[in-house]
Each structure stands twice: as C-alpha cells, then as structure tokens.
Design a protein with these regions (language model features):
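Alpha-helix capping and helix-loop boundary segments enriched in small/acidic/polar residues
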Residues: 67, 162, 225-228, 267-270, ...
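N-terminal FAD cofactor-binding segment of flavoenzymes
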Residues: 1-49, 335, 339
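Ferredoxin-type iron-sulfur electron-transfer modules and their immediate structural context
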Residues: 31-46, 331-465
Length: 468
C-alpha cells in the first residue's frame, strides 16, 4: 500500500498479549487500542430465528475478556511509527516482487517491483527500475498466501511434513450505525445460516466506538457446491432479522476481503530456510478457533527477529535460524495453537459434529486431548462438479442493506491505473474453460469478492477475462 495500514481492513478483535511483551507501556505510548471488549454473544442462526448460547457454555476460545476491538489499520500505523522512532527504515509503496538468492541458493534479499510499466510490461516515461534490498537474513511477512512465501514453500519443500493447508475468504464491511444501535465493546459471533451445515464458516459483528460496527463473514474454501458465492452469502447474511436490525438506518462506509490461512498447527510449514524465515500469516499462524492472528504475527515476528539478531551477533548469515522454531515450540503461542490444533479438522466434518467435538475438546477438556485429527484434503479437492448441485438463487441487492460487487469495490480503498500490468496471470490458459467452466460452471466468477474473474465470449467462444 501507499502507506502502512493501507492494505489492512479495519475492524478486528485483538489479543494484546504479544503487544504487551513488545511494548509493556503501550497504553502510555498511545497505542490505538481504545475499545475493550465488554460483552460476548454467540448465536446459532436459522433462516428466520436465532439462539444465543449461554456464556457459561462457551469454550474459552470464544471469549474475549481482556481483548480489544480495534482498527487494525491504525494499530499497524502506530507500530510503524514506533519502528521508525527506533531507526527502522520502512518503504511503503514498494512491493517485494522477486526473491534474491546467493551462489549457494540461500535467500539474500528481495527485489522491489519496477514502477511505470504499461499493460504489456513495457517501460513508460514514468518507469522506475526495482531496487535490490539485500540482507543477512530476510523475514517474509506478506500475510495469507503471500506470493513470495508460496515460492519459498515450494522451492525448499517447507510443507512436505505438514498437513494440507486450508484457507478461507473473509469479507468485511464497516458501517456507521444509528447511535441507539451502537454498543461499543460488544462482540457477536454467529454460526449456521446462511451457510449449509457442510460448509465451514461463520460471521461476526464488532461494535467499535464512534457508532462504527464491523460486520463480516468467513467462508472456508473447502466448500462443495461450485455455485456458492461467498460475496452473495455475506450480503444475504445481513438480511437475517437479528443482524439486519443493527444496520437499518445506517450507512456502509468501507468494504474489503482477505484470504485467511486456517489450517492451524498441523498445517504449518517449516518456518525457516537458508537466509530467512516465514512469520505471521505467511506461514499460517492464525488461530482459527479464536479468529485471531494479529497477536500471533507480532509474536512470531519477535521470535524470528530475536533469532536473527543472535545469529548476526555471532557473525552468521544466510543459514537457517533454527532458534526461531525452537523458541516457538517453547512459547505460549505454541501452547495456544496446540490446544486448538483439532478445530479446523473437526469443523471440516460439518457444523453439527464439529460443534459437538470442539465443545468436548475446548470446553470440557480445555484443549488438552491426547488425540490429533488431521486434514486429509486440500481445499480445491473438495469442490464437486456442477452437475451434482443446483444453482443458488441469491436475492437482488436493495442498495440499503445489501449491495452488488461494483459498488462494494468502489469503497474498498483499492485502485490501479488502467494501463498497468495485470498482476494475476494464468499458469495454464486452457484450464479455466476446459476444466473450470466445463465441469464446475466457472466458480472463479463467484468466489472472487471483487469480480476480478469474468467469462466473456470472443468469436462465439468463452474465455476467462481477468479484470486487474
């Protein structure tokens, strides 16, 4: 992004544990953790009704006492200011485009993306060549499915001993609601409708200050029905009587979507390789049972940084920071993720069995169980042919509570020059039409929450158009 926080979607519940370790006096320093969670609600939804789970029945992972509802964009900006105050140089607006390797094959830095290229990749009069940024160690913190992180995992086979990774798409809106409906500190999580019981996912409402409410839906990408549209599921979620009442009379002010890495501890790849390490969601440290990853990103960043500093003080470079994974093994974060290791595998077996087993493990046994449940399949292997399913009839947007993709993207704080290079490219041009469209009815035109993928006809033949 053009500035720190530009790519962060506001509205998150943050566990301050790692931040307190990093800056014990964060309150005095003015960290923007302003709205402490005051109340938790967990609802099971059917199409027209809801059931609130009594708080005494909720597992600890669903409780948020001591946590804060924050604008994560503001938190990252504040962290950036603290880093710069300590002498750290930050280069916003310069994406890392390529990995640099030395003669032995170890990572030795990155190359930033070249600026001022046209749609065909040719230099314009605004051209600026990317820069080489070299270091003794490089830590990759791109977030979920980072494009360099994926390359590193493949090159060094970092995931060869891990379970298949599992992902979700999280779609979120920020609303300004009527003052009478604002309840700062209230956290609401829901399960059930609008998703089918065999589709992993859940929803949330976070009441921030200043009459702001963040609302979102997470859909696991292991769903079976290729006609499912996470965007449309989110829009109709807001039509539920229990949810709609919060937003009637309000105004939507921001929209966005992000990938989530949700496989958990058993899907974590090896975190280190010659010359660097993966941290945060680039590795997959999200605790899916808590829907929280920011505290894990801070903690793993600290552990990797401590390992790198120790190595440099020993005049080392470009080797493996083995003290980072060992420090993680001995950390409270490993304990937390270990207790939640079965959450995603259980929930992948359906809402009812998953809820029963998660309740047993997390509420009755506090996550301390002798067994481990493993994910067996990658998400894409779960998608079934369109012939086995019926198209889903989603309600038309009303422009008040529900909206279309185009108007949503307009308020997503994303923009690009029409003549800039397409940043999404296909490995095999024949796959979209010959497989995706023919067998699965073109699911990419539905799963993308920004309408990037579109099937159009050219000379009477369908082709996939990428609008990016």
């Amino acid at each position: 992004g053009s500035e720190i926080g530009a790519h962060i979607l506001s509205g998150a519940v943050m566990d301050p544990k790692a931040l307190t370790e990093l800056f014990p006096n964060w309150k005095e320093l003015g960290a923007p953790l302003d709205t402490e969670v005051s109340q938790d609600q967990f609802l099971f939804l059917t199409k027209d009704s809801s059931f609130q789970v009594p708080n005494w029945m909720l597992p600890h992972c669903f409780k948020n006492e001591g946590n804060y509802i924050v604008s994560l964009a503001n938190v990252t900006r504040w962290l950036g200011q603290q880093a710069e105050n300590l002498g750290v140089e930050i280069f916003p607006g310069f994406p890392a485009a390529e990995i640099l390797y030395n003669d032995t094959g170890a990572v030795c830095g990155v190359i930033t993306g070249s600026m001022g290229l046209d749609k065909e990749g040719n230099p314009t009069d605004q051209f600026q060549l990317g820069m080489e940024l070299r270091g003794k160690y490089t830590l990759f913190a791109e977030g979920s499915r980072g494009h360099l992180g994926k390359q590193l995992i493949a090159k060094f086979a970092l995931d060869k001993d891990a379970d298949p990774q599992s992902y979700g798409i999280g779609i979120k809106e920020l609303w300004e609601v009527e003052p009478s409906k604002s309840k700062p500190g209230l956290v609401v999580h829901t399960a059930g409708w609008p998703l089918e019981s065999d589709t992993y996912g859940g929803s949330f409402l976070y009441h921030l200050g200043d009459n702001k409410v963040a609302v979102g839906l997470v859909v696991g990408l292991s769903y079976k029905n290729p006609y499912l549209s996470p965007f449309e599921e989110f829009q109709r979620y807001k039509l539920h009587p229990k949810i709609r009442e919060t937003f009637e009379g309000g105004k939507r002010i921001a929209y966005g979507a992000r990938a989530l890495t949700a496989g958990g501890l058993n899907s974590l790849p090896k975190m280190v390789f010659p010359g660097g390490a993966l941290i945060g969601c680039d590795a997959g440290f999200l605790n899916a049972s808590r829907i929280k990853g920011s505290h894990a990103a801070i903690k793993t960043g600290m552990l990797a940084a401590e390992a790198a500093v120790a190595a440099i003080n020993e005049n080392r470079s470009a080797d493996e920071l083995t003290t980072y994974p060992s420090a993680f093994q001995n950390s409270w974060l490993h304990t937390e993720l270990n207790q939640a290791r079965n959450f995603k595998p259980w929930m992948s077996k359906g809402l009812y069995l998953g809820t029963l087993m998660v309740g047993l493990e997390q509420k009755l046994l506090s996550g301390n169980v002798p067994w481990t449940v493993h994910l067996k399949h990658a998400d894409h292997e779960c998608l079934e042919p369109a012939a086995q399913h019926k198209p889903i009839d989603y309600p038309k947007p009303d422009g008040k509570i529900t909206f279309d993709r185009l108007s949503s993207v307009f308020i997503s704080n994303t923009n690009h020059a029409e003549n800039q290079p397409v940043h999404l490219t296909l490995k095999n041009d024949s796959v979209p039409v010959d497989i995706n469209l023919k067998t699965y009815a073109g699911p990419e035109q539905r799963y993308c929450p920004a309408g990037v993928y579109e099937y159009v006809e050219t000379d009477g033949k369908p082709r996939l158009q990428i609008n990016s």
